[in-house]
C-alpha cells in the first residue's frame, strides 16, 4: 500500500498569496521548515539576501540546498532559488534518501526522510545507530548541524530525545 505523503514524485508545488506550498503533506512540511515557503530564503537570512558571497555559500531556496548537494542534483547556484527546479532536485534527493534508508534498514518515515534531507543519509544513519545507546546528541549529530537541534532538547540530551523531538515537530 502506497502512503500518500510518500508519493513525492507525483506531488505539485504552487504559490498562494506569495508563499510556496505543496499538495503533499510531507513536501509542504519540508518547505515550511526549510524556507517558510520563500524561494529566496538563505540559511540565516529567512527573507533572503543580495550578498553574492552569502548566497553562493549557504543553504538556499525552498528546500535549502547547499551548493554541493544542489550541484549533485543538477542545480546551478542561482537555480536553487527557482522553486520548480529546486523541487525537481528535491524529488531526486528524496528518491536517493529512500534508497539509502532502505539499504541501512532504517524505516521510511516522514521524520527519517526529513532528517536524511537535513543531515544527509549518512548523518541520519549515525544518529539512528546512536538512538538506543544513550549517546549525547552532540556526539551523534554532524558537527556542522549543531544549529539544527530542537530548542526544547538540551545539548547533552541523548540522541533518542533529539530524534523524538524532531518526530513530534515533523508531525506528518
Regions found by a protein language model. Give the residues of each.
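Short, functionally critical alpha-helical segments immediately adjacent to catalytic or ligand/cofactor-binding
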Residues: 21-51, 65, 90-92, 111-121
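Short, surface-exposed glycine/acidic/tryptophan-bearing loops
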Residues: 42-72, 133-137
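Short, charged low-complexity linear motifs
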Residues: 50-51, 99-105, 143-150
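Alpha-helical segment that forms one wall of the substrate-binding/catalytic cleft
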Residues: 62, 67-126
Amino acid at each position: 500500500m502506497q502512503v500518500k505523503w510518500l508519493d513525492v514524485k507525483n506531488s505539485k508545488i504552487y504559490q498562494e498569496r506569495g508563499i510556496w506550498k505543496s499538495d503533499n503533506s510531507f513536501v509542504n512540511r519540508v518547505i515550511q521548515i526549510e524556507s517558510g515557503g520563500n524561494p529566496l530564503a538563505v540559511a540565516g537570512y529567512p527573507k533572503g539576501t543580495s550578498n553574492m558571497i552569502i548566497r553562493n555559500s549557504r543553504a538556499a531556496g525552498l528546500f535549502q540546498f547547499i551548493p554541493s548537494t544542489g550541484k549533485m542534483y543538477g542545480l546551478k547556484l542561482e537555480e536553487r532559488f527557482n522553486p520548480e527546479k529546486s523541487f525537481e532536485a528535491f524529488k531526486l534527493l528524496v528518491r536517493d534518501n529512500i534508497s539509502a534508508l532502505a539499504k541501512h534498514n532504517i524505516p521510511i518515515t516522514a521524520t527519517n526522510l526529513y532528517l536524511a534531507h537535513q543531515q544527509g543519509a549518512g548523518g541520519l544513519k549515525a544518529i539512528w545507530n546512536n538512538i538506543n545507546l544513550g549517546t549525547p546528541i552532540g556526539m551523534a549529530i554532524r558537527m556542522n548541524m549543531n544549529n539544527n537541534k530542537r530548542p526544547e532538547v538540551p545539548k547533552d540530551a541523548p540522541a533518542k530525545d533529539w530524534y523524538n523531538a524532531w518526530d513530534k515537530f515533523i508531525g506528518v
